Amino acid sequence: MPGADYSAVKGGGLKLKAGKKNLFKVGKEKKKKNKDDKEKIDPDTVENGGWRKIADEFDMKGGTNVAIEVASGAGSTRTYVAAMDNGKFTIGFPHPEGEGPNPEEIFALVKTPDDSKISLKTGFGRYVGVDSEYQLVAMAEAIGSREQFVLVFQEGKTAFQAVSSPLFLSTVPNKEGHIYVASRTATENEMVNIRTDAIQEGPVDWRSVEDRKNARECETAYVKMYQHSKVDLKNRHIAIDVKDKKGVKKAQADGSAHELLLDRRMKMKSDRYC
């Protein structure tokens, strides 16, 4: 309007009638709240000096430190499997609340992402294994079948099983104080807690670069990979089934993309010469 007095207009930022809070701050507050939730400490971890319990195989990372705690129906016992300087093992003394395992109760975990078998190395530089009398020992300087184990996770409980025999570690020492891997079934005396001081990370996608692509690009990559090197790799030489990409997507998720794509490739070749 001509002649209006614009100097009387109060300056400032845009004010929204929806509420007093700035809408742009809502996301930040939510993000901060989620961050605080992630940083919450598990009381069980605090009681064990920062050593958290491993609940499944996917949390087992090679190169980390682990300890084998004697499990109990009442919860944490803070009692661990301990290596002795004579190569044998015993059950250590209970730790006070808030204290982690001793150095002789800590093992270096050896594991590859694509294998469920694990190996453990003591602070004395020897690998944990089972001798001919089924005694838990650490004598070997290299890993063999006797130095390999699997962890059985079921219904929130964990058992320690040898690969060389279908026997489980018992946490009940003999008269000499040594422990054995000689139990045929996993009962209360065979229950353990595997603990680590490593920071828990999110799930890791171990699939290859090709498997992580979308269905069409994934199949194209594998056709190129398995074609003869002398074949020109222009699009006219690459036979791709443009139908049924749902099967490829499912195989990518299941980890069976290699087999499915090779089967599809063979079928396309056979159809061509029919």
From Swiss-Prot:
Primary location recorded for the protein, binned into one broad class: nucleus
Segments of skewed composition (Basic and acidic residues): 34-43
Keywords in alphabetical order: Actin-binding, Cytoplasm, Myogenesis, Nucleus, Ribosome biogenesis, RNA-binding, rRNA processing
GO process annotations (BP): actin filament bundle assembly; muscle organ development; rRNA processing
Annotated spans, Disordered: 27-46
Function: Binds to mRNA in a sequence-independent manner. May play a role in regulation of pre-mRNA splicing or in the assembly of rRNA into ribosomal subunits. May be involved in mRNA transport. May be involved in epigenetic regulation of muscle differentiation through regulation of activity of the histone-lysine N-methyltransferase KMT5B.
Family classification: Belongs to the FRG1 family.
Protein's UniProt name: Protein FRG1 homolog
Naturally occurring in which organism (per UniProt): Caenorhabditis elegans
Annotated gene: frg-1
